[in-house]
A protein has these predicted regions:
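Walker A/P-loop
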Residues: 238-261
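Conserved helicase/translocase P-loop NTPase motor core
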Residues: 359-416, 426-427, 610-677, 824-826
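Conserved motor-coupling elements within RecA-like helicase/translocase cores
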Residues: 377-385, 791-824, 837
């Protein structure tokens, strides 16, 4: 059989030199995959096979799944609809007698359809499809990197307080680093099986090494139960095979189990990864496990080290603990060797070390001291540690040193077990992580500094500016005019598109809307429209359309722009009405804006390292997740770029890169064997609220295999909790931004008697709002009303201006020692991840007041994306599709349909939502309320009062006049009833939620009403 190189050489002898051989072969590889999966499939949609969609829905484990997974990596550039159209067109234009496939066009149901078939008369390399498949299966990506040899190098140091960049020179002796070498990738992982007795024995060992450790007492007092076909019974063994979902209510010992299991497996020389919520949690876990002799290390980002130091530094201590300092404050060897540094550039540059940016002759080199440098020790320790601890972001994005491999790739190849704590939050975080968004208006404001610096340069400095940088600055200087041109075009040309433009949109969406209009009225030929589109995306050239695009983003040239469009329409025999003409104009403006953003993105990538600034949009543009896209399934609607015109925030840009949650719930299958069997690590999912059927964001679609049940007395105590509807008629949530602050203070004023009574009870008070600004408003108002020395603290971000009435988010775990009696916090910031307890481990809070209905902003792009992913996992049945092509096409069409539905319902009344989306709202609010309630349920002292929960916002109830309106408290009762009464999964819900359910039903009656009407499904202010 021939090799791929032989085929390339043969084709070069026959094909014209104008044909790109690599693209030619990519086209044939992709078509060969389509032929294998569905010979009668549409070749223009063959790119759908390159998205790794076999992992979604019911996972397919066969040889074809492995082949497609490898093709997803190798042919990733062809997975784009636009790129594939270019590659396919160029292939069709090549000489057909040398092509593996030939094409015919047929008319079916009035539409032109492209068909393809094998060229049976092919004389040159006729067996090359088999060669392609072999090459795809065996392909491995090469990584090219080079260490600095002996000689003179330079590197840059950024002043973190300004945009100033300093340079330093260093002379490096010749040395070759002895970097750790990763062993060969592991094959399929054996299931992990450990008995409860073995876990208890390991917990005893931990207690012997550290007598005050609590793991044994907690593990012994809680009960592990197995779930089999809806039946629940006690289990004496924990088995983790591929992916295992273990749930348990707050206080059931999930974190304890994670610690003991990590210790137990480390003794057996297993490689375990723990994925936690915050960097401080990561560092604390490493410090904890190291006390027992476990070989453990963190993997965290480099750029935030100064912030991490503040988070783990203990009050009144002069030095960090060694477990922290060896990773956070270690010096850089190169920095110590540097010469001609200025005073300002001589400070420790934590997180900005030149590990990959030593410069010589305009080329970057890796530091030759990576193998011994203290500053990057944590990335070397990955290779030798039994237990590695990281965050979601660390797992998804960090690269290891040396060969620059993704840490995720290393985990897929080497880890025996990955444990995701709070897995329901993890999946939401992953979905949002791979759907970044950015404000173009903020970018425009930030660009002013760089443009001002350039304008103030002396002539000599301006002449000496690097070409890429000067080009980038010129593009930035256009940003104000571009922003105004786009927003004014939306206002002037929107016409009947008001609905479309109120949602997320892109040039492609506008083009499809134009095509629909044209089908009704036939203003212009379909051929002319398609030609216009092809020019805007670079598939064709047309000097007239390109001239129009040149003036599309210039306010000063609006007359030229309009005149040129009129001329082009006339030349194409088009006599449109004003609305259609305006829509053409708006499409071209948005298409030109797309191109402008791509130009900025490309220019930024080629900037010198020292001139790259950390700004929201530049991060958005430069973070392309290229390596991650080759591992994860693509976004269900494709890796899209789009925008939203927000009246308050301006132009918001967004991208969808990947089906984020697959990193967690499909991890064992992210690497497949040749036979299609999972070759990734085993996964253990832990959470107290991941079983919330109907919740698109938080429900984890992995069957529950184990339950962890807390002690009976704790369940009884939680069931004794007081749930009280305060019955206020004042609605905070859903009110307009003008009334919202006033309504919030009115609610506080009305319930002040209850607040003062709670202050006389045991425990501190927690007040829940929806944003940091609301927290500030509520805290200030409460401090004015309170007497007897009682005080309030509001949670604030790290970057906020700090005063004595604030508490940093990173410090709230120590609130029991704070002087304040009340803490006001945004729901999304405190819902989980913090055990706010006293010295005995009992919750610092005795009661919680929901001053608002704790909803996130439902019309946020990232929120809709995670809901879409949840919907597709739960409702898009793909198992009935026999081949990968049909599965991919079904997924894409269903995703598009559901996204459109969510866009339409974004501003609807809650009571008007379709059943799936309405259930999602209820289930999501339940999870949020339950998690916040969990801050009160850390119970160690049975003698203390049970928690108290107050619902203060009138928006928890519907209007008495609107009996069909949305009543959250009624809906929660119905939702809990349906889960507890479910014959198949009721036992799971009972174990998790029965105590909350009992307390809620005792305290909250159905059919109570507020006296103000239901409002729209939208919150004005975002968390």
């Amino acid at each position: 059989m021939s090799s791929l190189e032989t085929i390339k050489k043969s084709l070069r002898n026959y094909l014209p030199t104008s044909v790109n051989i690599d693209d030619f072969i990519k086209a044939e590889m992709t078509l060969a995959l389509l032929e294998k999966c569905k010979p009668e499939g549409d070749p223009t949609k063959a790119y759908l096979l390159l998205h790794n969609y076999s992992l979604l829905g019911e996972v397919v484990c066969d040889e074809t799944a492995f082949l497609l997974q490898k093709a997803h990596r190798l042919l990733h550039s062809c997975s784009s609809k636009m790129n594939w159209a270019k590659v396919l067109e160029n292939y069709r234009n090549a000489q057909s007698e040398f092509c593996l496939y030939i094409f015919t066009e047929k008319i079916e149901k009035g539409s032109k359809i492209l068909k393809f078939a094998r060229n049976t008369e092919l004389a040159v390399e006729p067996d090359r499809a088999d060669v392609y498949f072999k090459y795809i299966r065996k392909h491995k990506e090469d990584r090219h990197f080079e260490y600095a040899k002996g000689g003179e190098y330079s590197y840059s140091i950024k002043d973190k307080t300004s945009s100033t960049v300093y340079s330093a020179d260093v002379k490096i002796p010749d040395r070759t680093p002895q970097m750790p070498i990763s062993p060969p990738p592991k094959k399929t992982r054996k299931k992990i099986s450990v008995s409860t007795d073995e876990l208890l024995a390991s917990a005893v060992e931990m207690a012997e090494k550290k007598p005050d450790d609590y793991c044994y007492s907690i593990l012994k007092s809680n009960t592990l139960k197995a779930v089999t076909e809806g039946n629940v019974k006690s289990a004496n063994r924990l088995e983790i095979d591929k992916i295992t979902n273990l749930v348990g209510m707050v206080g059931s010992g999930k974190s304890t189990l994670m610690k003991v299991l990590s210790y137990h497996l480390a003794k057996a020389d297993k490689k375990v990864l723990l994925v936690l919520d915050t960097v401080s949690s990561v560092l604390e876990m490493c410090s904890y496990l190291s006390q027992f002799g476990v070989s453990v290390s963190p993997v965290i980002g480099r750029s935030g080290r100064e912030k991490y130091i503040d988070q783990v530094a203990k009050a009144h201590e002069k030095y960090l603990q060694n477990e922290y300092s060896k990773y956070l404050t270690a010096p850089c060897i190169i920095d110590g060797m540097a010469k001609n540094k200025s005073d300002k550039s001589s400070v420790p540059m934590f997180g900005s070390e030149p590990c990959r940016s030593l410069m010589k002759n305009k080329k970057h080199y890796n530091c030759p001291y990576m193998d011994i440098c203290p500053a990057v020790r944590m990335y070397r320790d990955v290779y030798t540690s039994n237990v590695i601890v990281t965050t979601v972001q660390g797992l998804a994005a960090i690269r290891l040193l040396g060969d620059n491999k993704l840490f995720l790739e290393y985990v897929l190849e080497q880890a025996d077990l990955v444990i995701f704590d709070e897995c329901d939050k993890v999946q939401k975080t992953l979905d949002e992580f791979f759907t970044p968004s950015a404000s173009f208006d903020k970018f425009r404001q930030n660009a002013a500094t760089l443009c001002s610096e350039a304008m103030n340069k002396e002539t000599e400095a301006l002449d000496g500016m690097e070409k890429n940088e000067s080009g980038y600055i010129r593009k930035l200087m256009r940003s104000l005019g571009v922003c105004m041109a786009v927003r004014e075009a939306i206002s002037a040309y929107g016409g009947t598109w008001r609905t479309i433009l109120s949602r997320t949109f892109s040039a492609e969406i506008l083009y499809q809307a134009i095509c629909r209009e044209n089908q009704k009225n036939k203003y212009i030929s379909d051929k002319s429209l398609e030609h216009m589109r092809r020019v805007t995306i670079g598939l064709d050239h047309d000097k007239d359309i390109e001239h129009i695009l040149k003036f599309a983003l210039s306010e000063d040239d609006i007359k030229i722009f309009s005149s040129d469009i009129s001329d082009w329409l006339t030349d194409n025999n088009c006599k449109p009405d004003k609305t259609f003409s305006d829509h053409i104009k708006l499409y071209l403006v948005v298409a030109a804006f797309d191109n402008y953003i791509r130009e900025i993105s490309d220019s930024y990538l080629f900037l010198p390292y020292e001139r790259k600034t950390q700004q929201e949009l530049t991060d958005f543009l430069s973070t392309r997740f290229t390596a991650q896209q080759k591992i994860l399934p693509s976004s269900a609607m494709g890796n899209l770029f789009g925008m939203k015109n927000d009246p308050q925030k301006g132009l918001i840009l967004y991208r969808q890169y990947a089906f984020g949650r697959a990193l967690m719930d499909r991890m064992p299958w992210l690497r497949l064997t040749d036979e299609g069997q999972p070759a990734g690590p085993n996964v253990l999912l832990l959470s107290g609220s991941s079983w919330a059927d109907g919740c698109l964001q938080y429900h984890v679609n992995v069957p529950v295999k184990y339950l962890l049940e807390a002690e009976e007395w704790k369940r009884r105590k939680i069931a004794e909790s007081k749930m009280i509807d305060l019955g206020t008629a004042i609605r905070v949530s859903g009110s307009g931004s003008e009334e919202r602050e006033e309504n919030l203070t009115e609610v506080i004023k009305k319930i002040m008697g209850t607040i003062e009574a709670e202050l006389r009870s045991e425990g501190k008070l927690l007040m829940i709002v929806n944003s940091y600004s609301e927290a500030q408003t509520a805290a200030n108002y409460l401090n004015r009303l309170l007497s007897n020395g009682k005080t309030v603290a509001c949670m604030c971000r790290e970057a906020d201006e700090f005063d004595e009435n604030m508490i940093l988010r990173s410090e709230i775990a120590d609130f029991s020692d704070h002087s304040a009696d009340i803490m006001v916090a945004p729901a999304q910031a405190i819902e989980r991840g913090y055990n706010i307890v006293d010295k005995d481990g009992h919750s610092a809070f005795g009661s919680v007041f929901f001053l608002v209905r704790p909803m996130e902003v439902p019309d946020e792009i990232s929120s809709k994306c995670t809901k879409l992913n949840g919907y597709l996992e739960r409702h898009c049945v793909l198992s009935g599709k026999k081949n990968a092509f049909d599965r991919a096409a079904k997924l894409r069409s269903e995703a598009t349909r559901q996204w459109s539905l969510m866009e339409r319902q974004g501003k609807m009344q809650l009571s008007s939502l379709d059943p799936v989306m309405k259930l999602d709202v209820t289930a999501s609010l339940f999870v949020l309320i339950l998690q916040i309630f969990g801050r009160l349920c850390r119970i160690t002292d049975e003698s203390k009062p049970a928690p108290r929960v107050y619902f203060a916002d009138g928006a928890f109830r519907r209007s008495e006049k609107n009996t069909a309106g949305y009543d959250l408290l009624n809906e929660l009762i119905d939702y809990l009833d349906s889960m507890i009464d479910n014959k198949e999964t009721g036992k799971i819900a009972e174990t998790l939620y029965q105590p909350f359910y009992e307390a809620f039903k005792k305290g909250v009656e159905k059919n109570e009403f507020a006296d103000i009407s239901d409002d729209i499904y939208s919150e004005e202010e975002e968390f």
